[in-house]
């Protein structure tokens, strides 16, 4: 697909968190008319999965298009297993949360890890 409307001729791999739920739609930043709001488009899905590994594997098997954060597909994009389509239609950024015990003095190694991860994720913004 080269344009948003081209997606209608393709199928996606559906992703749903629970059995029987509707799959998530394709999400993109709608810049038509300068709106700059996120919009959704439901694509036909022949298969729906409920975990990230199955989602990627279904795409690799040719069962449809998937929408994942670049960091999740980095290796497949680099080795050519995945081909990025419609890169201008970015989905909303996904937050990453780090949970740690509430302590007055945070261990240095925890702080170093948090700083490293934060810097690493800046690459994917």
Language-model region placement:
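C-terminal regulatory
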Residues: 1-93, 123-125
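A late-sequence structural motif
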Residues: 85-125
């Amino acid at each position: 697909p080269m344009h948003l409307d081209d997606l209608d001729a393709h199928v996606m791999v559906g992703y749903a968190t629970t059995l029987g739920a509707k799959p998530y739609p394709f999400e993109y930043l709608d810049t038509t008319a300068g709106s700059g709001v996120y919009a959704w488009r439901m694509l036909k899905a022949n298969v729906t999965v409920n975990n990230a590994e199955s989602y990627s594997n279904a795409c690799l098997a040719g069962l449809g298009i998937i929408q994942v954060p670049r960091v999740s597909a980095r290796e497949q994009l680099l080795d050519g297993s995945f081909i990025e389509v419609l890169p201008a239609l970015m989905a909303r950024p996904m937050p990453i949360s780090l949970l740690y015990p509430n302590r007055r003095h945070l261990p240095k190694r925890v702080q170093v890890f948090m700083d490293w991860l934060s810097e690493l994720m800046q690459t994917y913004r």
